[in-house]
């Protein structure tokens, strides 16, 4: 007979490691962060999302460098508004035409007052 209790991330019972929120909420938060990064070119986040955020932001720049209609539609599917898509293809992507990857950097920025969470500044490399 299976044990009763909360399921952890891997589907097993017991509270070993619980997900903070669902996969859909996680992806939506990531999309919002990458949209803000494209618009403002520099954002401050907690350390948990940095790796995925950098990966997705680098992929968006790669799509912008391609510049065709299919790449624009793929970027529009991820980014939250048309302003971000336009800025990605017209301003950001041309700056990196001679660079092969590594478009973002992460700089540790101390801890947040209140919950002591590690803050990280994510920005595009100029």
Give the predicted meaning of each segment:
Residues 1-95, 116-126:
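Ribosome large-subunit tunnel/peptidyl-transferase-proximal elements
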Residues 107-112:
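Short, solvent-exposed loop/turn elements at beta->coil junctions and helix N-caps
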């Amino acid at each position: 007979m299976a044990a009763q209790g909360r399921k952890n991330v891997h589907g097993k019972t017991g509270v070993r490691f619980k997900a903070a929120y669902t996969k859909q909420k996680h992806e939506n938060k990531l999309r919002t962060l990458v949209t803000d990064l494209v618009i403002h070119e520099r954002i401050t986040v907690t350390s948990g999302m940095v790796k995925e955020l950098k990966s997705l932001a680098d992929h968006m720049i790669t799509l912008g460098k391609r510049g065709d209609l299919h790449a624009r539609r793929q970027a529009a599917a991820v980014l939250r508004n048309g302003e971000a898509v336009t800025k990605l293809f017209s301003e950001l992507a041309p700056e990196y035409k001679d660079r092969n990857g590594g478009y973002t950097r992460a700089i540790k920025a101390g801890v947040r007052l209140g919950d002591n969470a590690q803050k990280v500044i994510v920005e595009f490399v100029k």
